[in-house]
C-alpha cells in the first residue's frame, strides 16, 4: 500500500499530557482521539493502544513514549503520552518529545499531588510555554464547591511556578465517560480542544529564527578555501551573508561564499538542511567541531549555567555510584564534548544537596573550561569516558 502523503494544509503543533500517576492522562488521550474520530479528525485509539508505548532511545536513554496524531478544525497535532513518571522526566529533560504546550491532567477527586507539582516545575524549567488544565474525573465529585476548591488550588499552584494561573483555562472533564460515549462529557472534550487551539500559541518556525549551524566537520578545498559542514538548526543562510564563528576560541566574523548540499550549489540553506558552507579567509585550523556558525550578534558564548538534570540509573547504563559537588565530567553540547565541573547541586525547594545518586533528578550549576554557545532551553548530555551518565537542559545562563 502506498504511504499517505502528509498534507500540510494546517499549522502543526506538538503537545502532550502531563500530571500525576493515575489521574487519567492516557484515558484522556484515548478520549480525545475517540471524540475527534467521530468527526473524521483522528483515528480512534483505546487505552491499551496508547499504554503499550514502545521504547525509544534518545541521547542514549531509553524512554517509553506513545505518539498519537489528530486534527481540530484549525490545526494538526502530534500528542505525546508517557506510561510512567520516570519516562516523563526523561522525556521532558532530553526534549525527545518537544512540547509547544501541554494539557496538565488533575483528578478532581485528589487535587494536585506530588507529580502534578513536579511536572509543572519541569514544564517551567524545560520551557514548555503554555498549559491548559483538564480537571478529570468530575463525574465522581457531586459537590460543585469541591471542584471549585480544586480549581482554585491548581490556579495558585500554577501562579507559584510563574505560569499565568488566573488566565490558564481549566476545563472540567470525565475522560472515562467521554470514552464510553456519554454525549455530555464528549462535549467537554470538544471544549478542552477548543481551549488548546486558542490558548496554546503556534510555535515560531525554526526557519524564521536567526541562523545557527553547529559545526560537525571541517575540510579545506584547494583553491577554494575552508568548508564547514553540519545541519542547520534554525534560520537560513545565503551566499554573501556574514556569520560569526562562536565558541571554544575568540568569536570571529567571516562571509559565506558558497552553500552546498549533496555536492550541489544552493542559493540558500534553511533549517533542517545538511550543508557545507564555504567560508572566506578562514584557515582549517581556525574552526573545529563544536563551534557554531551564527547570524552576527545573535548569540554569545558562555561558561557557567544552571541545568535541570536526570542522572541515569545503573540499569540504564549510568554510574553505579553517587557523585558529589566538584565532579568533573564531559558536557556533550550540540556536536562536541567540553570538560566542565559541577560546582553545586540544588533540590526543588532550593536547599543544597551534597550527593547525587543514579536515578535522581536534580538542578546543578556547571562551569565549562572554555566558552561555548549555550542557550536557555538547550539540551546537553553528561558523559564520562564516552558513555552517557546523565541528560540535562539549560534552565539559566549565569556567565
Curated annotation (Swiss-Prot):
Stated role: GTP hydrolase that promotes the GTP-dependent binding of aminoacyl-tRNA to the A-site of ribosomes during protein biosynthesis.
Gene: tuf
Region (G3): 81-84
Chief location of this protein within or outside the cell: cytoplasm
Start and end residues of each stretch annotated as G2: 60-64
Region (G4): 136-139
InterPro entries registered for this protein in UniProt: EF-Tu_GTP-bd (IPR041709), EF-Tu_GTPase (IPR050055), EFTu-like_2 (IPR004161), EFTU_2 (IPR033720), G_TR_CS (IPR031157), P-loop_NTPase (IPR027417), Small_GTP-bd (IPR005225), T_Tr_GTP-bd_dom (IPR000795)
Chain residue ranges for the region called G1: 19-26
Gene Ontology terms: cellular component: cytosol
Pfam families: GTP_EFTU, GTP_EFTU_D2, GTP_EFTU_D3
Annotated EC: 3.6.5.3
Name this polypeptide is given: Elongation factor Tu
Cross-referenced PROSITE patterns: G_TR_1, G_TR_2
Record keyword Hydrolase present: yes
Residues binding GTP, per UniProt: 19-26, 81-85, 136-139
Lineage of source species: Bacteria, Bacillati, Cyanobacteriota, Cyanophyceae, Synechococcales
Gene3D superfamilies found in the cross-reference section: P-loop containing nucleotide triphosphate hydrolases (3.40.50.300), Translation factors (2.40.30.10)
Similarity comment text for this entry: Belongs to the TRAFAC class translation factor GTPase superfamily. Classic translation factor GTPase family. EF-Tu/EF-1A subfamily.
Amino acid at each position: 500500500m502506498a504511504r499517505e502523503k502528509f498534507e500540510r494544509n494546517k499549522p502543526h503543533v506538538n503537545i502532550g499530557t502531563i500530571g500525576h500517576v493515575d489521574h487519567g492522562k492516557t484515558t484522556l488521550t484515548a478520549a480525545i482521539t475517540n471524540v475527534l474520530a467521530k468527526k473524521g479528525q483522528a483515528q480512534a485509539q483505546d487505552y491499551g493502544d496508547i499504554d503499550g508505548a514502545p521504547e525509544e532511545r534518545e541521547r542514549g536513554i531509553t524512554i517509553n513514549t506513545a505518539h498519537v496524531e489528530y486534527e481540530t478544525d484549525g490545526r494538526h497535532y502530534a500528542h505525546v503520552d508517557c506510561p510512567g513518571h520516570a519516562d516523563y522526566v526523561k522525556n521532558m529533560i532530553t526534549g525527545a518529545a518537544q512540547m509547544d504546550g501541554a494539557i496538565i491532567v488533575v483528578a478532581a477527586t485528589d487535587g494536585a499531588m506530588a507529580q502534578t507539582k513536579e511536572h509543572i516545575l519541569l514544564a517551567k524549567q524545560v520551557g514548555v510555554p503554555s498549559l491548559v488544565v483538564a480537571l478529570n474525573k468530575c463525574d465522581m465529585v457531586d459537590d460543585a464547591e469541591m471542584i471549585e476548591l480544586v480549581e482554585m488550588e491548581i490556579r495558585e499552584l500554577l501562579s507559584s511556578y510563574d505560569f499565568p494561573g488566573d488566565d490558564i483555562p481549566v476545563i472540567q472533564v470525565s475522560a472515562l465517560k467521554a470514552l464510553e460515549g456519554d454525549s455530555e462529557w464528549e462535549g467537554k472534550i470538544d471544549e478542552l480542544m477548543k481551549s488548546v487551539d486558542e490558548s496554546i500559541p503556534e510555535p515560531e518556525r525554526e526557519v524564521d529564527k536567526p541562523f545557527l549551524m553547529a559545526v560537525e566537520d571541517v575540510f579545506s578545498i584547494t583553491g577554494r578555501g575552508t568548508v564547514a559542514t553540519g545541519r542547520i538548526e534554525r534560520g537560513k543562510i545565503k551566499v554573501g551573508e556574514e556569520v560569526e564563528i562562536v565558541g571554544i576560541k575568540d568569536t570571529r566574523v567571516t562571509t559565506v561564499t558558497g552553500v552546498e548540499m549533496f555536492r550541489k550549489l544552493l542559493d540558500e540553506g534553511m533549517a533542517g538542511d545538511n550543508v557545507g558552507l564555504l567560508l572566506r579567509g578562514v584557515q582549517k585550523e581556525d574552526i573545529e567541531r563544536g563551534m557554531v556558525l551564527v547570524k552576527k550578534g545573535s548569540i554569545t558564548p558562555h561558561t557557567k549555567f544552571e541545568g535541570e538534570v536526570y542522572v541515569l540509573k545503573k540499569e540504564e547504563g549510568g554510574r553505579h555510584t553517587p557523585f558529589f559537588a566538584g565532579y568533573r565530567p564531559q558536557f556533550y553540547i550540540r556536536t562536541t564534548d567540553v570538560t566542565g565541573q559541577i560546582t553545586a547541586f540544588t533540590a526543588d525547594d532550593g536547599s543544597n544537596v551534597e550527593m547525587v545518586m543514579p536515578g535522581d533528578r536534580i538542578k546543578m550549576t556547571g562551569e565549562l573550561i572554555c566558552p561555548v554557545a549555550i542557550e536557555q532551553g538547550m539540551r546537553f548530555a553528561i558523559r564520562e569516558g564516552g558513555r552517557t551518565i546523565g541528560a540535562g537542559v539549560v534552565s539559566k545562563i549565569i556567565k
